[in-house]
């Protein structure tokens, strides 16, 4: 792609340091018109200042797109992923990963609407996000072109970025000196990387955590809540129906209050290196525990076991950027089929970093039958039936043993 061939670019724009510099750099290096796209996916910051910043950098008002995508994010991306109980490498709830396909989708759609040649993003050449953004974009438009400034320019340090900003009159509130953590926030989580976290043996500082109280300082009194599920999705809290993004917002509030959802892990990036990250996912941690609880009484055993076998593959696809892939959609179809009878309520107690399931019920799809599993006398289960069941399942061992084979 020749720079002279680029006439218009849609930039994923936050209004922060990196993307403001990218905006100016695109104007200078590519001599092109820039369209900015700012998504509100619940990052907890005002997005309107991005409009003022973009205008100050010469962007036409009609080329500024600021959209509230919180409901679409939770309804069409977070909830489908939580139906799968997706966890990457046993711990990570995929808060950053699941936000990228939605942003890629809107970048491509805005590019089509504005007749732009390219899309651009602020992901570095070391991380997973460049892969997620670009694979998503190519899946939705195979003819799209992508400009990834971090893979082109030489502004490869925070000090160089600040110097570039000062040289070009870009108003950046953060000053030289101690850099902030590299953070990503949305309605599902906040992630932290960099600084002391680059040493995996160095404990994170308490003042790093922005969202949740320390479990040590959480209230001495617990909260007990009831979450209602329909077809595998939460639809109400304490009998109050809510929209998807409202449910996650309320669970975040409750989880953060009780110090729930903090995580410190070393993960394997798709690009090949190991990375240490800290995460806060208060509402997601509650949702995962509650969802597994309602599945435990409504799902058939073999269907549940098969779903658990599929989950790591599903989680890897999301983590690596393959949300729009045919294989993820195939898995999603199977997962969604499994959720048709996942209906009912779960009661959880929230206390000092813990989510404890204390009750689960389903009026319509409960497979738990007390008459069969009671320790008291019953009239529906003949315990003698177990004789044949055990002998048939032991038959291969009996035959092999009689043939002299040792186990």
From Swiss-Prot:
For biological process, the GO terms are: argininosuccinate metabolic process; L-arginine biosynthetic process; urea cycle
Subcellular locations according to the entry: Cytoplasm
- Entry annotated with the keyword Protease: no
Q: Which Gene3D superfamilies match?
A: Argininosuccinate synthetase, chain A, domain 2, HUPs, Single helix bin
Catalytic activities: L-citrulline + L-aspartate + ATP = 2-(N(omega)-L-arginino)succinate + AMP + diphosphate + H(+)
Q: Name one Pfam family in it.
A: Arginosuc_synth
EC class (word): ligase
The UniProt record lists the EC number as 6.3.4.5
Instruction: Provide the Gene Ontology terms for cellular component.
Output: cytoplasm
Keyword line: Amino-acid biosynthesis, Arginine biosynthesis, ATP-binding, Cytoplasm, Ligase, Nucleotide-binding
Q: Name one GO molecular function term.
A: argininosuccinate synthase activity
Pathway membership:
Amino-acid biosynthesis; L-arginine biosynthesis; L-arginine from L-ornithine and carbamoyl phosphate: step 2/3
Give the residues the record marks as binding ATP.
Answer: 12-20, 39, 122
Which parts pass through the membrane? none
The UniProt record gives the binding positions of L-citrulline as: 92, 97, 128, 132, 182, 191, 267, 279
> Which residues hold L-aspartate?
124, 128-129
InterPro entries annotated for this entry? Arginosuc_syn_C, Arginosuc_syn_N, Arginosuc_synth, Arginosuc_synth_CS, Arginosuc_synth_type_1_subfam, AS_cat/multimer_dom_body, Rossmann-like_a/b/a_fold
**Subunit arrangement?**
Homotetramer.
State the family named in the UniProt similarity comment for this chain. Answer: Belongs to the argininosuccinate synthase family. Type 1 subfamily.
The name under which this protein is listed is: Argininosuccinate synthase
Q: What is the lineage of its organism?
A: Bacteria, Pseudomonadati, Campylobacterota, Epsilonproteobacteria, Campylobacterales
